[in-house]
C-alpha cells in the first residue's frame, strides 16, 4: 500500500505519464492484477479512447476507466448491495414532491416556496450536498437545536426555521430510501463500505487523474482505495514551488494544494507509505511559444509580456450572432487551410443558454460537425407535454390552454390520418372552442355541441343552414378525437385506489394512443432528414417515461394519492427528465461549458462570450442557503460546498485551466450586444491577456461585409447556405451606392447561384427580394367586379375604412379576412348591448305613447334591469352568464344603462326634441327601411351606402320641422371637420342627409325637414370629484355635465333653445353650444349654418363618389393615413398581412395636416364649389 503524487502545471504531461505507464504495463503483463483508472465523469469517454489509442494496446481486460459512480456499480455487482432499486434525479424529485406535499402544514419556510419553479431541483441538490459532505439528518437536527437556542435576530430565526424544514425533509427522504432505494449519492457511500470486500480492487494499481478537489465523501473513497490498492497514483495540477510555501488562498493553485495536503493527511492516518512526489517541469503540450508563455506566467504580477508572434487571437463582435459566425469561419479555415481535424478544435463558453441554439443553427449552416455537451431537458418533447397537459386537463377541469397544449403534441391524432389535414381541422376546431368559450363540463357532457354563426342581437332565427350543419358534424367528430382518450384515462384515475393503478391509467392512455408507433414514425422522419441526434430523442423519451412510471410504482405503488398530488408529483418527475448526450461521431467540434469540461488533446480552443459578469463569473447567491448562512453552519462544524467567496477565489484557477487547454492556437472573443441588442461589456480578463501579448491586435467581427477589405470579404464566402445572405448584402449596397470594381468576385459568387442546377431555384426567391417593393398592385376591373360585385353595397364605416387605408378595405371587404372570434366581451359587444338596451326601452315607451321625460327614477332602474336580463342570453353566446366575473360585469353594465336612462330622462325634460325612431335602417330593404344613398359611378357601377341610424329626434316650431341625429357611443367622441374633409368621419352627416332627404315620405305629415344637428351621446357611468360637502342635487348636476352631447348643431338660437329649453345665456349642460347676452353664440359653440350643413352634405356625396370610383377601379394602395398622433395602423387587424414597414422606401404614411374647423370648412367649400 503506497501513495504517489504526480504534480505539475497544466500541460506538463501528468495524464500522459500515467497513461504511458498503464500502456507499458499492459504491454508487458496483459493479464496481471487490476489497473483502475479513475477520472471525473465527463473525462471517461476521452480517457478510454486515449488508453487504447496506442498501437501496442488495442484493448484491455486488465485496465478499466471508471468514474466514482461507475466504480460503485462495479463493486456492488461484485460483492452485493446493488439489489436496491436505483432512483435517478427524476425519481428523487418525485419523492421529494410527495414528502413536501404531505409535510406542507408543518413547514415553516418552504410551505410557499415549494410552489416556485426549480424548488425541487434546489432541494434535491441540497440533500445531495449533505450526503457528499457526510452530513446526516441527525447532524442537521443537532444544528437546528443549536441555532434555535441562540436565535435572537430575524436572520438567525429564519436560518433556524430553514434548517428545521431541511432536517424534516431530509429525514423523511432518508427514511423513504432505507432498505429499498439508492440515489446517486448513496452509491458512493456504499462504495466506501464495500471496497474492503472487493477482490477486484484489492491489490489493484490505481490511478486517479483529472481531479482538482474531493468532497468529504469522495475523500473517504480515496482513503479506502489507498487501503485496498497496491499503489494509488494521484495527479494534481500544482506548481512544485507552491508546495514549498505556506498555503495562501490567493495562490493560483490554492485549491489543489489543499487537496494535496488533505490526501497526505489521510495517508498518514492510515499509515500508508507516501512515495516521492514526481514533479513534471516541462511543457510538452504546448507547440506554441506564446501558449507556453501564457501558461508559465499566467499568475505573474505584474503581467509578463510576450513580444514574439503570438498564436493568440482576441476579437470583439458586433453581436452574439456575428461572434458565432466568426468562430465558424475560422474553424472552416483551420480545417481547410491548416489540415486540422474537427476533433482538434473545442469551443468553451459559460452562458450556454444564450449560445447553444444559435450555435446549433449556424454550425449546421456552415457544415461543421459538432457536439454540444449539454443536458437537454425532455420537458418540450411531445410525449412529455402530452402526459403533463392531459393530467392538467383532468385535474384542472378541462381548461382551454391545457386541452390545446395536448392537442398540439399531435399524439391524440389517429394513427391512420394525414397529419396536414388533421392540423387544419384542429385549427378550425380550436377557433370554435375559443369563440364558444368551451371548457369544463362541456367537454365531458354527452350533449352534442351546437354551431351557429353569430350575427347580431336581433337575429333570433333558430334555423340551421347546411354549411352550419356540416361544420357542426365536424366539430363533434373532432371533439371525440380529443376527449375520448382523455376521458378514459380520467375515469381510470378516479377509480384507481393506488398509485400503481394511476400509473397504469397513464400507461394505458399512451398505449391506446399508439404512442410507440407514432414516436417510431417521428424517429424515421428525423433520420430521413439527417437529424440523427433528434432521431435518438424519440427512443430515449419513451424509455425514460416508462422508467419514470416504473420508479413511481416502485416507490409509492401501494400508496393512495389524490389526483392533484399525483399530477404534481408526475409533473415534477417529467420536468427532471433529460436526454443523454451521446456523441454521434468521433470527428467533431466539441462545444462545452468551461466549468464542467475536461478537455485533452486539443490543438485550438475558442473561448467565447468573455463578457463582464460571465468570465470571471459574477457572484450569485443560488440554492437553499445563502453565503452568510453557509458561513454560520461552517463555523458550527458543518462543512458544505464552497461559498460564493470561495468560488470567486477558485475562478482564477478555472480560467487558468481554460486558457491552457489548447496546444497550438487560442481564440478569445466577446460580443458587444446580445441577441436582443442589449449592450454587453468586455471582460477584464481580455485586458489581462492583452497586457501579456501587447503585439496582439484586437480584431472586430461584423456581419456587415461592406466595410471590410477584399481579402477579409473573401473569408465570408463559405457554404452556399451562408454565403447567399452576404451576396444579398452586396447587391443591396450596389443598388443603393453603385458598383465597386475591386469587389467583383461577388459577381462570381452571384453567377454560381444563378447557374447552379442545385441552387438556381433556391436562390431565385431570395434574390428576387432585392427588387421587392411592398406595393399592392392595382386590381383589374374583372377582379374588382368578382370581389365586390356589380353593385357595391356598403356601410359608411366601410367607406371611412377605405379612406383610412385602401389596403385594409381590400383585406376586410375584398378578401373577407377577419380575426378569429374569441369568447370575450369586447368594446363592440358592449356597444351593441348598449344600443339594444336603449332601443328596447325606447320601443316600450313608443308603444305606450310615453317619452323619456315620463319615467321616474325607479322606472329607469326597473327597465334597465329588465332589458339587460332580456339581452344577456343573446349576447356573444351567453357570455354574460358564463362566469361570476361576467355576472358582475353584467351588473355594472346594467348600472350604466340605469345612469344613461336617468340622463335621457333629464334631457327629455329640457328638450323640445323627441325621438322619432331608433335603429332606423336605410338601404336594408323590408318594412320601415329608408332607401339607400345611391350613386351611379362613371364606370357604370352602382353603389349603395346603407346603414342603421341610432336615433332620430324631431322638433317643430313656427319655422318648420327640424331633425337631428343622436349617435350612442361607449367612448367620448367629437365631430372633427378635418376628419370629415379627409373622409374619415362621414357617418353622422350621412345619417343626417338620409333622414332630411327622405323626410317628406318618411314622416307622417309629409313635409320637408331642416337639419338641426348631429350629436354624440356618451354612454357611461361617470365618477365626479366634488369639493366639500356637496348636496345630492349638486352631484347630479355635475354628472349631467359629463353627459353633454358633442357634435355640430344648427347655428340658430331658437333651435338650440329647443334642444335645451333651460338655456338663456351661458353654456348649455346638454349640448356643446352656448349663448351670449346679445343672443349670439359663444366662441366655443360647435355650430354650422343651414347653408354649411348643405355644403357638408354635398361634400359627403362627393367623397362617396370618389371612394366608389377608387374601389371599382381596383385601388388597394398600402397607404395608411397619419394625422398627429392618430394613424390607421394603430388598431388595424391586418398589419401582418400588408407588412407595412416605414423603413422601406415604398411604405410611408399618408400624412394629413390637422386643421381648425374653420379652415377645414373652407377647404370643403372649395371642393364642392360652395359659397
From Swiss-Prot:
HAMAP family: AddB_type1. PANTHER family: RECBCD ENZYME SUBUNIT RECC (PTHR30591:SF1). Heterodimer of AddA and AddB. GO terms for molecular function: 4 iron, 4 sulfur cluster binding; 5'-3' exonuclease activity; ATP binding; double-stranded DNA binding; helicase activity; metal ion binding. One of its GO terms (biological process) is double-strand break repair via homologous recombination. It comes from Bacillus cereus (strain B4264). Its EC number is 3.1.-.-. Its cofactor is Mg(2+); [4Fe-4S] cluster. Keywords: 4Fe-4S, ATP-binding, DNA damage, DNA repair, DNA-binding, Exonuclease, Helicase, Hydrolase, Iron, Iron-sulfur, Metal-binding, Nuclease, Nucleotide-binding. This is ATP-dependent helicase/deoxyribonuclease subunit B. SUPFAM superfamilies: P-loop containing nucleoside triphosphate hydrolases. ATP binds at residues 8-15. The heterodimer acts as both an ATP-dependent DNA helicase and an ATP-dependent, dual-direction single-stranded exonuclease. Recognizes the chi site generating a DNA molecule suitable for the initiation of homologous recombination. The AddB subunit has 5' -> 3' nuclease activity but not helicase activity. Belongs to the helicase family. AddB/RexB type 1 subfamily. The keyword DNA-binding applies. It comes from the Bacteria. Binds 1 [4Fe-4S] cluster. [4Fe-4S] cluster binds at residues 805, 1129, 1132, 1138. Despite having conserved helicase domains, this subunit does not have helicase activity. Residues 1-390 form the UvrD-like helicase ATP-binding domain. Signal peptide: none annotated.
Amino acid at each position: 500500500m503506497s501513495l504517489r503524487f504526480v504534480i505539475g502545471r497544466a500541460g506538463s504531461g501528468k495524464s500522459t505519464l500515467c497513461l504511458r505507464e498503464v500502456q507499458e504495463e499492459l504491454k508487458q503483463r496483459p493479464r496481471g492484477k487490476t489497473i483502475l483508472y479513475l477520472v471525473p465523469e465527463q473525462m471517461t469517454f476521452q480517457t478510454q479512447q486515449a488508453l487504447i489509442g496506442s498501437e501496442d494496446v488495442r484493448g484491455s481486460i486488465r485496465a478499466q476507466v471508471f468514474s466514482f459512480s461507475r466504480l460503485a456499480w462495479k463493486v456492488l455487482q461484485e460483492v452485493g448491495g446493488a439489489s436496491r432499486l436505483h432512483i435517478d434525479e427524476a425519481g428523487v424529485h418525485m419523492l421529494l414532491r410527495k414528502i413536501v406535499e404531505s409535510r406542507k402544514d408543518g413547514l415553516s419556510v418552504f410551505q410557499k416556496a415549494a410552489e416556485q419553479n426549480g424548488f425541487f431541483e434546489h432541494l434535491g441538490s441540497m440533500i445531495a450536498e449533505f450526503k457528499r459532505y457526510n452530513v446526516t439528518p441527525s447532524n442537521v437536527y443537532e444544528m437546528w437545536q443549536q441555532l434555535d437556542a441562540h436565535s435572537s435576530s430575524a436572520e438567525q430565526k429564519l436560518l433556524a426555521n430553514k434548517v428545521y424544514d431541511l432536517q424534516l425533509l431530509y429525514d423523511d427522504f432518508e427514511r423513504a430510501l432505507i432498505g429499498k432505494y439508492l440515489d446517486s449519492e448513496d452509491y458512493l457511500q456504499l462504495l466506501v463500505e464495500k471496497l474492503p470486500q472487493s477482490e477486484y480492487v484489492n491489490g489493484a494499481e490505481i490511478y486517479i487523474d483529472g481531479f482538482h478537489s474531493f468532497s468529504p465523501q469522495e475523500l473517504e473513497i480515496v482513503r479506502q482505495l489507498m487501503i485496498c490498492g497496491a499503489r494509488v497514483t494521484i495527479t494534481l495540477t500544482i506548481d512544485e514551488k507552491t508546495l514549498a510555501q505556506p498555503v495562501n488562498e490567493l495562490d493560483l493553485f490554492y485549491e489543489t494544494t489543499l487537496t494535496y495536503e488533505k490526501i497526505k493527511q489521510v495517508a498518514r492516518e492510515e499509515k500508508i507509505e507516501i512515495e516521492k512526489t514526481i514533479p513534471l517541469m516541462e511543457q510538452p503540450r504546448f507547440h506554441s511559444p506564446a501558449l507556453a508563455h501564457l501558461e508559465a506566467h499566467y499568475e505573474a504580477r505584474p503581467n509578463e509580456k510576450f513580444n514574439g508572434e503570438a498564436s493568440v487571437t482576441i476579437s470583439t463582435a458586433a453581436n452574439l450572432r456575428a461572434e458565432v459566425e466568426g468562430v465558424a469561419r475560422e474553424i472552416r479555415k483551420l480545417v481547410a487551410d491548416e489540415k486540422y481535424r474537427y476533433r482538434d478544435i473545442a469551443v468553451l463558453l459559460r452562458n450556454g443558454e444564450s449560445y447553444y441554439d444559435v450555435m446549433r443553427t449556424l454550425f449546421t449552416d456552415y457544415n461543421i460537425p459538432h457536439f454540444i455537451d449539454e443536458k437537454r431537458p425532455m420537458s418540450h418533447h411531445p410525449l412529455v407535454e402530452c402526459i403533463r397537459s392531459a393530467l392538467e386537463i383532468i385535474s384542472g377541469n378541462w381548461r382551454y390552454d391545457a386541452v390545446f397544449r395536448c392537442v398540439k403534441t399531435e399524439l391524440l391524432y389517429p394513427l391512420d390520418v394525414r397529419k396536414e389535414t388533421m392540423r387544419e381541422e384542429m385549427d378550425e376546431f380550436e377557433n370554435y372552442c375559443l369563440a364558444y368559450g368551451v371548457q369544463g363540463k362541456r367537454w365531458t357532457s354527452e350533449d352534442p355541441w351546437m354551431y351557429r354563426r353569430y350575427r347580431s342581437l336581433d337575429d333570433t332565427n333558430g334555423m340551421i343552414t347546411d354549411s352550419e350543419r356540416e361544420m357542426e358534424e365536424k366539430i363533434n367528430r373532432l371533439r371525440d378525437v380529443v376527449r375520448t382518450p382523455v376521458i378514459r384515462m380520467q375515469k381510470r384515475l378516479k377509480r384507481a385506489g393506488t398509485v400503481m393503478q394511476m400509473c397504469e391509467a397513464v400507461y394505458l392512455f399512451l398505449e391506446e394512443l399508439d404512442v410507440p408507433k407514432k414516436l417510431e414514425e417521428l424517429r424515421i422522419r428525423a433520420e430521413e432528414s439527417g437529424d440523427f441526434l433528434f432521431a435518438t430523442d424519440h427512443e430515449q423519451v419513451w424509455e425514460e417515461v416508462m422508467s419514470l412510471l416504473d420508479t413511481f410504482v416502485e416507490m409509492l405503488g401501494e400508496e393512495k394519492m389524490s389526483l392533484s398530488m399525483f399530477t404534481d408529483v408526475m409533473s415534477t418527475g417529467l420536468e427532471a427528465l433529460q436526454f443523454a448526450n451521446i456523441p454521434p461521431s468521433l470527428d467533431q467540434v466539441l462545444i462545452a461549458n468551461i466549468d464542467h469540461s475536461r478537455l485533452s488533446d486539443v490543438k485550438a480552443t475558442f473561448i467565447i462570450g468573455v463578457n463582464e459578469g460571465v468570465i470571471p463569473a459574477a457572484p450569485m447567491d443560488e440554492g437553499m442557503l445563502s453565503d452568510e448562512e453557509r458561513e454560520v453552519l461552517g463555523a458550527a462544524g458543518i462543512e458544505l460546498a464552497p461559498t460564493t467567496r470561495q468560488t470567486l477565489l477558485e475562478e482564477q484557477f478555472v480560467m487558468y485551466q481554460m486558457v491552457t487547454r489548447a496546444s497550438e492556437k487560442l481564440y478569445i472573443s466577446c460580443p458587444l450586444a446580445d441577441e436582443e441588442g442589449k449592450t454587453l461589456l468586455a471582460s477584464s480578463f481580455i485586458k489581462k491577456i492583452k497586457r501579456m501579448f501587447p503585439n496582439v491586435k484586437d480584431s472586430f467581427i461584423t456581419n456587415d461585409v461592406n466595410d471590410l477589405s477584399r481579402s477579409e470579404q473573401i473569408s465570408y464566402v463559405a457554404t452556399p447556405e451562408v454565403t447567399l445572405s452576404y451576396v444579398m448584402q452586396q447587391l443591396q449596397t450596389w443598388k443603393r451606392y453603385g458598383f465597386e470594381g475591386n469587389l467583383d468576385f461577388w459577381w462570381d459568387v452571384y453567377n454560381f447561384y444563378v447557374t447552379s442546377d442545385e441552387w438556381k431555384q433556391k436562390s431565385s426567391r431570395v434574390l428576387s427580394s432585392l427588387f421587392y417593393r411592398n406595393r399592392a398592385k392595382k386590381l383589374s376591373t374583372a377582379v374588382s367586379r368578382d370581389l365586390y360585385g356589380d353593385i357595391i353595397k356598403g356601410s359608411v364605416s366601410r367607406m371611412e375604412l377605405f379612406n383610412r387605408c385602401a389596403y385594409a378595405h381590400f383585406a376586410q371587404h375584398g378578401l373577407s379576412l377577419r380575426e378569429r372570434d374569441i369568447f370575450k366581451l369586447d368594446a363592440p359587444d358592449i356597444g351593441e348591448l348598449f344600443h339594444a338596451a336603449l332601443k328596447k326601452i325606447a320601443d316600450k315607451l313608443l308603444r305606450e305613447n310615453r317619452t323619456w321625460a315620463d319615467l321616474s327614477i325607479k322606472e329607469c332602474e326597473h327597465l334597465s334591469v329588465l332589458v339587460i336580463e332580456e339581452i344577456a342570453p343573446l349576447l356573444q353566446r351567453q357570455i354574460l352568464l358564463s362566469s361570476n366575473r361576467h355576472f358582475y360585469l353584467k351588473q355594472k353594465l346594467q348600472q350604466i344603462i340605469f345612469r344613461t336612462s336617468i340622463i335621457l330622462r333629464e334631457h327629455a325634460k329640457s328638450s323640445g326634441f323627441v325621438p322619432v325612431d331608433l335603429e332606423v335602417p336605410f338601404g336594408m330593404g323590408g318594412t320601415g327601411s329608408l332607401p339607400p344613398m345611391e350613386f351611379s359611378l362613371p364606370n357604370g357601377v352602382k353603389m349603395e351606402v346603407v346603414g342603421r341610424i341610432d336615433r332620430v329626434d324631431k322638433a317643430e316650431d313656427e319655422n318648420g320641422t327640424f331633425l337631428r341625429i343622436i349617435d350612442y357611443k361607449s367612448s367620448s367622441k367629437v365631430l372633427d371637420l378635418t376628419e370629415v374633409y379627409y373622409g374619415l368621419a362621414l357617418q353622422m352627416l350621412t345619417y343626417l342627409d338620409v333622414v332630411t332627404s327622405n323626410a317628406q315620405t318618411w314622416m307622417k305629415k309629409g313635409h320637408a325637414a331642416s337639419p338641426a344637428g348631429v350629436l354624440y351621446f356618451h354612454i357611461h357611468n361617470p365618477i365626479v370629484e366634488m369639493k366639500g360637502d356637496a348636496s345630492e342635487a349638486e352631484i347630479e348636476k355635475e354628472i349631467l355635465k359629463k353627459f353633454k352631447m358633442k357634435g355640430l348643431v344648427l347655428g340658430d338660437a331658437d333651435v338650440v333653445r329647443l334642444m335645451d329649453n333651460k338655456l338663456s345665456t351661458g353654456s348649455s349642460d346638454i349640448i356643446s353650444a352656448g349663448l351670449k347676452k346679445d343672443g349670439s353664440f359663444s366662441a366655443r359653440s360647435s355650430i354650422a349654418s343651414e347653408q354649411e350643413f348643405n355644403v357638408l352634405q354635398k361634400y359627403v356625396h362627393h367623397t362617396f363618389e370618389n371612394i366608389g370610383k377608387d374601389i371599382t377601379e381596383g385601388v388597394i394602395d398600402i397607404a395608411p393615413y397619419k394625422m398627429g398622433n392618430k394613424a390607421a395602423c394603430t388598431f388595424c387587424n391586418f398589419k401582418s398581412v400588408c407588412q407595412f414597414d416605414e423603413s422601406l422606401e415604398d411604405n410611408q404614411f399618408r400624412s394629413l395636416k390637422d386643421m381648425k374647423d374653420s379652415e377645414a370648412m373652407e377647404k370643403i367649400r372649395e371642393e364642392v364649389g360652395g359659397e
